[in-house]
Swiss-Prot record:
Source organism (scientific name): Pongo abelii (Sumatran orangutan)
Gene giving rise to this polypeptide: SLITRK1
GO biological-process terms attached to the record: axonogenesis; positive regulation of axonogenesis; positive regulation of synapse assembly
Protein name, as recorded: SLIT and NTRK-like protein 1
Signal peptide, first to last residue: 1-17
Primary role: It is involved in synaptogenesis and promotes excitatory synapse differentiation. Enhances neuronal dendrite outgrowth.
Membrane-spanning ranges: 623-643
Length: 696
């Protein structure tokens, strides 16, 4: 019978996945009740799998697993955590969720998988989350969402997908999902259809659509009409046009149907027939741009009808050579002398300069395909094509370029020294691509570059010295990437005036060696980062306070810890952010100055983090310990010195006595004394050598 019991226990342990035990009972994790709810905190425990662990089975709990190494979730990963009511998995490097991973979590109402590396949501990704009401998946690498990804979430109300790489939402993605709050900020959406998408969320109460490259054309009419018919305060933030250029920076709600779709309903049978060929029109502005061959040139996202490129938001730069737009009949005339131009592109003369070559949206897959090569091109537009890589051989014939637009392609590879021949280039657009690393070698030769736009990429790493190759760089656009840190001296030797770092992954930014190098900054945008309010952010806060609101664009909201969530850190005092550093100091220790005492008691000194009159305990204690140890060694040294001197003194006395005895012995042994004892009369001393021992 005992053998059967042992075999049964062994088989049960094997079936349970070799569970080691309760994470609370074995104190693997911290388990505490907060306001009546059990919090199982397994933060930064190095977990790579959960199948060997279990949690309390007698009560419900909130499970915190952020900061581990759960990079992949396999089916039944949470089978032993069936009493969880919320699950936090931020910052795990999670990149794959196998369908069935959440089976057993039928009680979970809130799921946080933000700040990971998830690239797609497949069908049945969330299978098992029957009661899920809140899903947070911001700051990932989401590009693809299957139409059936959310079909199992029949109670989902809040969906947070901001700061990903989503360019489109599939049809019926929200079918049978009762969404009331939808956050799509900081993605790559150019349009949002009403049919089979927006029409499926009739109960929407809040929607956020900021920081997307909206293409304000006919396709956006349905979104505009839908926004006008939802509850008045449902739209949070702005929907700002990024293209076409004539509407760039304009709010969607300020546009008209005619603005978005100028050709709509323009054809009318009552209008007179077009004039004969010999008839002419008076010069005047046309509703839409035309190519040199007279065909309509439809505006594309991020591009201007005249080949221009968007400058996001308030980031204005000086007038570029493309600012002048030809009007009237002159715009429609072919180029003089039948100027050769690569197939599919349009070429224009720049007054008093070279050529402007517009190859936007021409299905170009390689710059090597652009033939014939024109050596006098000064502005080259290659936006909205299918270019995957660029090499230094591609620009050998374009040494006169001053503007290059490679935005909205599929560029993931930039060969070192690609731009080395472009010594006169001043504007470079490489936004909306797939770059992941920036290095000095990639930008070698751009000694006159003033404007660099690499927003909406997947940049995770900027190597030291990257921008040193561009000493004249003034405007740097790095927003909507995957940056978590910046190297020391990244801005050394560069006099930036405008810098955009919003919608990245920064938790804090160091002042020394990074921000303190921005001595010429007049505008910086840092919003949309998951700032962590801890002692490390205090110098950054003080730096931001010195800049002021006229330089620092938008508020900076805290992401962690929970008690500071979504708070503006400018409204918090330094001792709130770092209480251990700003511990109250006794007035007796600060009585040297009435003013400094007051500051120590209130903790409101504006720059107290750098104030030498207030010493951190972490500095004070080691200092006192050092003084104590030094004093102890000094006392011991003095004692040793005194003792050694005493011994030496005794030796000297002994040696002196011995010397005297030896001298006396010598005298007694002399022939003078041997002749007989010395006797003196009266008061004279009598010394008889024979009657005394010399050892006495």
């Amino acid at each position: 019978m005992l053998l059967w019991i042992l075999l049964l226990e062994t088989s049960l342990c094997f079936a349970a996945g070799n569970v080691t035990g309760d994470v609370c009972k074995e104190k693997i994790c911290s388990c505490n009740e907060i306001e009546g709810d059990l919090h199982v905190d397994c933060e930064k425990k190095g977990f790579t799998s959960l199948q060997r662990f279990t949690a309390p089975t007698s009560q419900f709990y909130h499970l915190f697993l952020h900061g581990n190494s759960l990079t992949r979730l396999f089916p039944n990963e949470f089978a032993n955590f069936y009493n969880a009511v919320s699950l936090h998995m931020e910052n795990n490097g999670l990149h794959e969720i196998v369908p069935g991973a959440f089976l057993g979590l039928q009680l979970v109402k809130r799921l946080h998988i933000n700040n990971n590396k998830i690239k797609s949501f497949r069908k049945q990704t969330f299978l098992g989350l029957d009661d899920l009401e809140y899903l947070q998946a911001d700051f990932n690498l989401l590009r693809d969402i299957d139409p059936g990804a959310f079909q199992d979430l029949n109670k989902l109300e809040v969906l947070i997908l901001n700061d990903n790489l989503i360019s489109t939402l599939p049809a019926n993605v929200f079918q049978y999902v009762p969404i009331t709050h939808l956050d799509l900020r900081g993605n790559r959406l150019k349009t949002l259809p009403y049919e089979e998408v927006l029409e499926q969320i009739p109960g929407i109460a809040e929607i956020l659509l900021e920081d997307n490259p909206w293409d304000c054309t006919c396709d956006l009419l349905s979104l505009k009409e839908w926004l006008e018919n939802i509850p008045k305060n449902a739209l949070i933030g702005r929907v700002v046009c990024e293209a076409p250029t004539r509407l760039q920076g304009k709010d969607l709600n300020e546009t008209t149907e005619q603005d978005l779709c100028p050709l709509k309903n323009r054809v009318d049978s009552s209008l007179p027939a077009p004039p004969a060929q010999e008839e002419t029109f008076a010069p005047g502005p046309l509703p839409t741009p035309f190519k040199t061959n007279g065909q309509e040139d439809h505006a594309t996202p991020g591009s201007a009808p005249n080949g221009g490129t968007k400058i996001p938001g308030n980031w204005q730069i000086k007038i570029r050579p493309t600012a002048a737009i030809a009007t009237g009949s002159a715009r429609n005339k072919p180029l003089a002398n039948s100027l050769p131009c690569p197939g599919g592109c349009s070429c224009d003369h720049i007054p008093g300069s070279g050529l402007k070559m517009n190859c936007n949206n021409r299905n170009v897959s390689s710059l090597a395909d652009l033939k014939p090569k024109l050596s006098n091109v000064q502005e080259l537009f290659l936006r909205d094509n299918k270019i995957h890589s660029i090499r230094k051989s591609h620009f050998v014939d374009y040494k006169n370029l001053i503007l290059l637009d490679l935005g909205n392609n599929n560029i993931a590879t930039v060969e070192n020294n690609t731009f080395k021949n472009l010594l006169d280039l001043r504007w470079l657009y490489m936004d909306s691509n797939y770059l992941d690393t920036l290095s000095r070698e990639k930008f070698a030769g751009l000694q006159n570059l003033e404007y660099l736009n690499v927003e909406y990429n997947a940049i995770q790493l900027i190597l030291p010295g990257t921008f040193n190759a561009m000493p004249k760089l003034r405007i740097l656009i790095l927003n909507n990437n995957l940056l978590r840190s910046l190297p020391v001296d990244v801005f050394a030797g560069v006099s930036l005036s405008k810098l955009s770092l919003h919608n990245n992954y920064f938790m804090y930014l160091p002042v020394a060696g990074v921000l303190d190098q921005l001595t010429s900054i007049i505008q910086i945008d840092l919003h949309g980062n998951p700032w962590e309010y801890s002692c490390t952010i205090v110098p950054f806060k003080q730096w931001a306070e010195r800049l002021g609101s006229e330089v620092l664009m938008s508020d900076l909201k805290c992401e962690t810890p929970v008690n500071f969530f979504r708070k503006d850190f400018m409204l918090l005092s330094n001792d709130e952010i770092c209480p251990q550093l700003y511990a109250r100091i006794s007035p007796t220790l600060t009585s040297h100055s009435k003013n400094s005492t007051g500051l120590a008691e209130t903790g409101t000194h504006s720059n107290s983090y750098l104030d030498t009159s207030r010493v951190s305990i972490s500095v004070l204690v080691p200092g006192l310990l050092l003084v104590f140890v030094t004093s102890a060694f000094t006392v011991v040294g003095m004692l040793v010195f005194i003792l050694r001197n005493g011994k030496r003194s005794k030796r000297r006395d002994a040696n002196s006595s011995a010397s005297e005895i030896n001298s006396l012995q010598t005298v007694c042994d002399s022939s003078y004394w041997r002749n007989g004892p010395y006797n003196a009369d009266g008061a004279h001393r009598v010394y008889d050598c024979g009657s005394h021992s010399l050892s006495d």
